[in-house]
Amino acid sequence: MAETKANPFDMDSSSFDAEKYLERLLKDCSLKQIMDTEAAVVKDTQTLHSDMQTLVYENYNKFISATDTIRRMKDDFKQMETDVNLLMTKMQSITTFSEQITGTLQGTRSQLCRLSEKHSLLKRLQFLSTLPAKLKSLIEEQNYAQAVQDYLHAQKVFAQYGRQPSFDGIQRDCDAIMADLKEQLRSDFQRAGNTAQSLTEIGELLLQLDEKTSDLASEMLTCAGKRLHEQIVMLQDQTERDMLEFVDMGIDGFLNDLALVVTSYFDMFVAKHYEHERDDFQENALQELNVFLNQNIEKYLTLVQDRVESDIGYGDTQVMLRALDRLHRRLQAMRNICRGLEVQRNTVSIIISAAHQLCDAHAKNLKDHFADSLSAVRLSLVSAKSDAAAGLNLGDLISNLYVSMVEKIKGVLQDLLIFLRTDWSFNIKAEHKGALCVEGIRENLLIGFLRHIAKVMCGFGDASSSSPPNLLLVLSKTCLELEQQGVHILIALVDDLYEIDSENSATLTHETEICAEMRETAQSLLDAYVRLQGTNISQMLRKSVETRDWLNCLEPRSVRAVMKRVVEELGSIETVVASLYEANTNATSGFRTTASSDSSRKTYFSNFASTSKPQYRSNWSNYTPSQLESSYVSNIHRLFSERVEIFTSVEFTKASIIMGIIKIGLKTLLECVRLRTFSKFGLQQIQVDAHYLQMNLWRFVSDENLVNFLLDEILGSAVQRCLESVLMEPNAVEIICERG
């Protein structure tokens, strides 16, 4: 590459030409620029001059320091040269002296080597000569490991000098001593009560003494099994300890010994190769060790499971799970102690089983609590002074029963949530059986208990049950509350706590199924209540009809007492029902506060008709006997054409409930009247009673036409069964009823 052309105008260049630079500067620049250039050049010159002075001063100091250093080095080298010369003189003297020693000892070196070898041999011979006595001493001190080590060390010497007659006796003595030791070790190996550590140590010594490997392997597992069985028996007696202490004892004793036996057996018989054994010895030994390990773990875990089962429902669940978590961690560690070993059973199955059993225990506790709550409700109803007083308290009874059940279930669900804590080393939801167990908490515990509630409550409504009416009303209302609120709250809670996707599961019970069962139970109990109260009213009416001589009656002067009693009883029932069910105030149903215009007139009964048919009333007092007789066929036709359903399901309203009771009572009265024969005064008494009922029953019902129809039927049947069909004057009936 060509060199850069020299620039005469560059002041930093070696080819700088001052004359040319000034000539160019005067030619190209103005006066001001020339003066500025001059000032810049002067400034740079001063700066360079200052830097040069600084550099000179610094280098001068360094030069002075270097001069001093060189001077000192010269002085040091002079002293060092003197020392080196002295060292060389001494090294020459040492070399000369060494050559003299070598020459002097050359003749005795071989003799010293021979003496050293003889000394070593004499020491070995001395070891052999004292070996029998030493072995006996070590055995007496029970220092078996040192005795075996010394004997094996001597075997090498015997192998070298064993043909010498002088050593033959020593070898026989040593062999005899070690044979006795071998028998003693074998006896100790088979003795019960040995720890796993001692079994391992004795097994190692027997192997060194050429015990048959296969026999020793089998015997080691047998003896270890006996020792482990003793520990199992000992653990069975530890019933007074809590679960955590019990598991700790098992880990520190049984499992640690088992792990020691397994690792020792593996190192002695599986990891080593023995020339004199069969080729499949190691494989068979590993298989036997696997069987031994799993058999003993199965025994121990069975014992743990029995203990868990005995503690379920009595001990602290958290303590139990802490113990099982600790055991699970220990077994997880045991799975990795030796390559090729497989632990088949783990603690998760025990934990899942414990969860199932705890669910069963909680289910039993829930059922017992529910039974106690029902007993408390029945006792409260029995101790109530009157139905009216009971009615005021029914709301509290229902609230207490409902809240106690819901809160008890919530508490149980929270208690069982401890199985799913994230700090446990196990995760039962990861197992298929564990996932089924979690779903079982929902299905078997919650859903099962809700169905148990429905079943038990429904049983109170059976005809064979002698349940008090108010109890049926309380249970019906409680079921209705569960259907409207409780079921949804509890199922949503369990799905949220246990992360269950019940909406997309085909196997889990849906909320609507349980709600339907609860509503069906509530309906059944309410219908039973209506039947029971209707039956009570019916019995009063039936007895009043059957016990009276209707052919020899006096002219009626008042309403019969039983009719007043019926109205009073209906009033008490209405008070109780009103405390639980609000009246429906729409136009077609609800509690009546005023009578219809028809019933307020001085006429008595209108034939039952639907709203699309015109109402009409029957004035029996205006009919002649022939007219009454001719109306018989029309009444029969009306009976079959306008049938009234008596035992139908009622609605969850006060008006519907009271109407159902009234229908049963009036239907019973109708049937009783049809079976009796009446005189004129008997017919008139029925007329007075029916009018009294019409005057008082309208306020209980929402459909006055239905009541009037049934009362029409009653009076019509009495007319048809009367020997002299003459009714009282309407004014007279009105006066008697108002006075009564």
UniProtKB/Swiss-Prot annotation:
Has keyword Acyltransferase? no
GO cellular component labels: cytosol; EARP complex; GARP complex; membrane
Q: Name one GO biological process term.
A: retrograde transport, endosome to Golgi
Q: Which SUPFAM superfamilies match?
A: Cullin repeat-like
Which superkingdom is the protein from? Eukaryota
Q: Which Pfam families match?
A: VPS51_Exo84_N
State whether keyword Coiled coil applies: yes
**Alphabetical UniProt keywords:** Coiled coil
Q: Which residues form a coiled coil?
A: 65-87, 322-344
Transmembrane segments annotated in the record for this chain: none
Quaternary structure note: Component of the Golgi-associated retrograde protein (GARP) complex.
Its annotated function is as follows: May act as a component of the GARP complex that is involved in retrograde transport from early and late endosomes to the trans-Golgi network (TGN).
Give the record's family classification: Belongs to the VPS51 family.
Name assigned to this protein: Vacuolar protein sorting-associated protein 51 homolog
Look up and give the organism this protein is from.
Drosophila melanogaster (Fruit fly)
